A protein has these predicted regions:
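Structural motif
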Residues: 42-44
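Pocket-forming structural segment of enzyme catalytic cores
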Residues: 88-165
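N-terminal beta1-alpha1 ligand-phosphate binding loop
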Residues: 2-23, 183-187
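Cysteine-nucleophile active-site neighborhood
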Residues: 49-120
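C-terminal and late-domain segments of enzyme folds
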Residues: 151-201
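Short acidic low-complexity segments
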Residues: 26-37
């Protein structure tokens, strides 16, 4: 079973529907026993890093996720969920992340040309940096759907692919049993489903 971690943030039901479409048994849950018993974890998320991080901390899910990841349980972060896998974010001040991946999360407006619209919303092609299980069923140049105003920086150790939007925007990351997508695979059509399938296998 795949546990979609419910901490009050994220497009949970759309994600579960996508997993169901590829024949994956997934449950939306905040129950620690179910999370511990799951084969793999997905950490979704939309909104502000600071608020989401606080909600994870309020019910102790942050410590559980860190412990399970360190034990080797596979975990995928999606959008804000991916950002929280890193060490810190500078959204509305400085907030500590889960620290499962090296890097930090910074504002796009501090790095991109003024003529580029923020938030970054739309379809962009993936450019591969290295091999990854996430790439198993997709090819370089496939398009995925982004909605975000912040992005990961200093994540060379885990970087799998990037999108071009004024500069190279990290799109997928993977290091050991921890991986993530800055884009929304559940909104990215067949390509997104293939990425979810690769993670869930």
């Amino acid at each position: 079973m795949i546990a979609i971690i419910d901490y009050g943030v994220g497009n949970l039901y759309s994600l579960r529907s996508s997993l169901k479409a590829i024949g994956v048994d997934a449950e939306i849950t905040s129950d620690k026993e179910k999370i511990m018993g799951a084969d793999k974890l997905i950490l979704p998320g939309v909104g502000a890093f600071k608020d989401a991080r606080a909600k994870l901390s309020d019910n102790g899910l942050d410590k559980l996720i860190i412990a399970l990841a360190k034990e080797g349980k596979p975990i995928m972060g999606i959008c804000l969920g991916m950002q929280m896998l890193f060490e810190r974010s500078y959204e509305y001040g400085v907030s500590e992340g889960l620290g499962l991946l090296k890097g930090e999360v910074i504002a796009m407006q501090n790095r991109l040309s003024p003529e580029l619209k923020i938030p970054h919303i739309g379809w962009n092609a993936l450019n591969f940096v290295k091999d990854s299980k996430l790439n198993k069923y997709i090819k370089e140049g496939d398009f995925v759907y982004f909605v975000h105003s912040y992005f990961a920086s200093g994540c060379e150790e885990s970087l799998v692919s990037f999108a071009e939007y004024g500069e190279q925007i990290p799109a997928t990351v993977e290091y050991g049993n921890v991986c993530g997508c800055q884009f929304h695979p559940e909104k990215s059509g067949e390509v997104g489903l293939k990425i979810l399938k690769a993670f869930c296998e």
